[in-house]
């Protein structure tokens, strides 16, 4: 792998440590990326351990060849939202000792201009995690209604000027279609009046389009529910989020399944019955990167790690 596209795994020790790895355990790395977390898991596993990695990026599948000679490792080409299906196909439901998810876009994806994720590098306006299938960002921007664009920018990017930006895109695309990342980034920079300090005006819109094109939040919901299904008792969830939308989903999921079922007041149900409906317990508080890690890797700044454990059935 070229140095240009090298990837530093965020919160590496904390995330893998949170899995509480057993020598003979079976683990899932749902976001293989370039293999940083997988490498750490394999180093801690014994000979009878097993690691199932998942990624929908063809470049990640290619990078997984570095572990081709390790019989404990296998890679699945697909989205982590379908992890329960993959585990069921392998006959391992209820036997998984840990699931690791490193959400969002990876550094190699951001740094490769041809992938179209970054407003700082000019490239095709693509943004697909799996660039072998599905609609590109350019194709969506060419056909989307103003209302739809505004909703995406507001919902997934928390963009205050969502409607104004959507209108300007619609007005400009009739003259010149948005085919390059620079085209879109330059338009947003030009029409944004109240710019945030130390943040490019296109940041939120690019995030929103990426999340929408890849159905990222739906994938997270599906992965969390799937993990709950496949985890063994005392199995661990170790999840890194990079923005508030992701972290909110993870935080609420852990809280909901840690509190047990909510029942109307007055129903004849015992505390023991409520306890039995609890499926998870949070392990400690949310973990943030240290100042030293942020200094080494600026992209770690917004990361949040949450760890939870599957309770007995």
From Swiss-Prot:
Keywords linked to the UniProt accession: Cytoplasm, Methyltransferase, rRNA processing, S-adenosyl-L-methionine, Transferase
EC number: 2.1.1.199
A single Gene Ontology CC term: cytoplasm
Pfam families documented for this protein: Methyltransf_5
Any one Gene Ontology molecular-function term assigned to this protein's record: rRNA (cytosine-N4-)-methyltransferase activity
Location in or out of the cell: Cytoplasm
Reaction catalyzed: cytidine(1402) in 16S rRNA + S-adenosyl-L-methionine = N(4)-methylcytidine(1402) in 16S rRNA + S-adenosyl-L-homocysteine + H(+)
Enzymatic class: transferase
Any one Gene Ontology BP term: rRNA base methylation
Annotated binding of S-adenosyl-L-methionine, by residue: 35-37, 55, 80, 102, 109
SUPFAM superfamilies, per database record: Putative methyltransferase TM0872, insert domain, S-adenosyl-L-methionine-dependent methyltransferases
Function text: Specifically methylates the N4 position of cytidine in position 1402 (C1402) of 16S rRNA.
The family this protein is said to belong to: Belongs to the methyltransferase superfamily. RsmH family.
Protein name per its UniProtKB record: Ribosomal RNA small subunit methyltransferase H
């Amino acid at each position: 792998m070229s140095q240009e596209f090298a990837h530093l795994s965020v919160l590496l020790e904390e995330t893998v440590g949170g899995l509480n790895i057993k020598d003979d355990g079976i683990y899932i790395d749902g976001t293989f990326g370039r293999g940083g977390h997988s490498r750490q898991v394999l180093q801690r596993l014994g000979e009878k351990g097993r690691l199932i990695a998942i990624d929908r990026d063809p470049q990640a599948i290619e990078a997984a060849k570095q572990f081709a000679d390790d019989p404990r490792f296998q890679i699945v080409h697909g989205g982590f939202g379908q992890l329960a299906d993959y585990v069921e196909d392998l006959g391992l439901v209820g036997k998984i000792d840990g699931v690791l998810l490193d959400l969002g876009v990876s550094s190699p994806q951001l740094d490769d201009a041809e992938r179209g994720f970054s407003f700082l590098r000019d490239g095709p306006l693509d943004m697909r995690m799996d660039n072998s299938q599905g609609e590109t960002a350019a194709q969506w921007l060419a056909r989307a209604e103003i209302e739809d664009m505004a909703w995406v920018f507001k919902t997934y990017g928390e963009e205050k000027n969502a409607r104004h930006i959507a209108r300007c895109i619609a007005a400009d695309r009739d003259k010149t279609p948005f085919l390059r990342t620079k085209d879109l980034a330059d338009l947003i920079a030009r029409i944004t009046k109240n710019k945030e300090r130390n943040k490019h005006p296109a940041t939120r819109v690019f995030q929103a389009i990426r999340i929408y094109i890849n159905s990222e939040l739906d994938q997270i919901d599906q992965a969390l529910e799937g993990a709950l299904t496949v985890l063994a008792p005392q199995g661990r969830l170790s999840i890194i989020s990079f923005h508030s939308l992701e972290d909110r989903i993870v935080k609420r999921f852990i809280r909901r399944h840690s509190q047990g079922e909510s029942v109307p007041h007055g129903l004849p149900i015992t505390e023991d019955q409520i306890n039995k409906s609890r499926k998870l317990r949070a392990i400690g508080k949310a973990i943030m990167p240290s100042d030293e890690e942020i200094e080494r890797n600026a992209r770690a700044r917004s990361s949040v790690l949450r760890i939870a454990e599957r309770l007995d059935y």
